[in-house]
């Protein structure tokens, strides 16, 4: 349930500029910011796979998560993101499309980005959601998220890039307030000026009353990206390799599904 919060903010993160997004990852944002007066429009689609469990805890619901994002450069080291999330759900109780909610995020570099060294950025976001993506039911949920981005390019003679993100947040709904934590990592190799290949890992957890672990999971999978001057596309596929608790009457407890494919398309202007 709470995992949707972090996916909302990580679905389309990257560098926004007159050129296309050069972040080779679909789940991890890089330590870059849009330049003043420049924009980027991004559309992400996450296709979920899993068992249709019907009523009850529907952790294996199937469908699509969509996020439309506009990045607006405010200065040389900061930008703001406007995000609209929607979805398509196929379950025993709900079949159809819906507008889930929106989010506003501010991102700022820590220092000046430079090659051959660690680069960092931070972001703060507010989100509002009116539909539960796991069930299609209407409800009101507000969220507050903080994110830290670290990026390392391994020199001008190396084509490797490493990114890690740490996200923490609070989610409040009719059931109360819970804490969420997500840690993502990505390692990619830039084969040429257009193609990149890599692997990503996403670990996440949700705590009720800030002290009781409700669920956690670890997902790993490959990613591939293609970039042109003003266009880029990234595809990532994740499999759940572990989770806690692992079963509930034989059912998987990951909030979305045991397998998902995420596609991110970006245009710079």
Question: How would you label these PLM feature ranges?
Answer:
Residues 19-173, 178-184, 188-269:
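Transmembrane beta-barrel domains of Gram-negative outer membranes and organellar outer membranes
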């Amino acid at each position: 349930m709470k995992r949707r919060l972090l996916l909302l903010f990580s679905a389309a993160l990257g560098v926004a500029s007159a050129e296309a997004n050069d972040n080779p990852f679909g789940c991890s944002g890089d330590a870059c910011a849009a330049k003043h007066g420049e924009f980027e429009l991004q559309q992400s689609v996450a296709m979920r796979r899993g068992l249709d469990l019907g009523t009850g805890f529907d952790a294996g619901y199937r469908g699509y998560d969509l996020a439309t994002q506009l990045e607006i450069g405010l200065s040389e080291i900061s930008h703001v993101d406007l995000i609209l999330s929607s979805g398509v759900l196929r379950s025993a109780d709900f079949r159809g499309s819906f507008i889930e909610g929106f989010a506003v995020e501010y991102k700022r570099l820590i220092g000046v980005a430079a090659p051959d060294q660690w680069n960092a950025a931070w972001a703060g976001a507010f989100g509002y959601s009116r539909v539960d993506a796991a069930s299609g039911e209407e409800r009101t949920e507000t969220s507050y998220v903080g994110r830290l981005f670290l990026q390392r390019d391994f020199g001008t003679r190396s084509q490797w890039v490493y990114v890690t993100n740490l996200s923490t947040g609070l989610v409040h709904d009719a059931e109360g307030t819970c804490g969420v934590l997500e840690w993502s990592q990505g390692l990619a190799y830039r084969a040429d000026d257009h193609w990149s290949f890599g692997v990503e890992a996403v670990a996440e957890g949700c705590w009720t009353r800030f002290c009781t672990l409700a669920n956690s999971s670890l997902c790993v999978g490959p990613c591939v990206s293609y970039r042109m001057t003003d266009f880029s596309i990234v595809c990532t596929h994740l499999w759940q390799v572990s989770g806690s608790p692992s079963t509930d009457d034989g059912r998987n407890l990951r909030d979305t599904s045991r397998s998902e494919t995420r596609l991110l398309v970006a245009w710079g202007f």
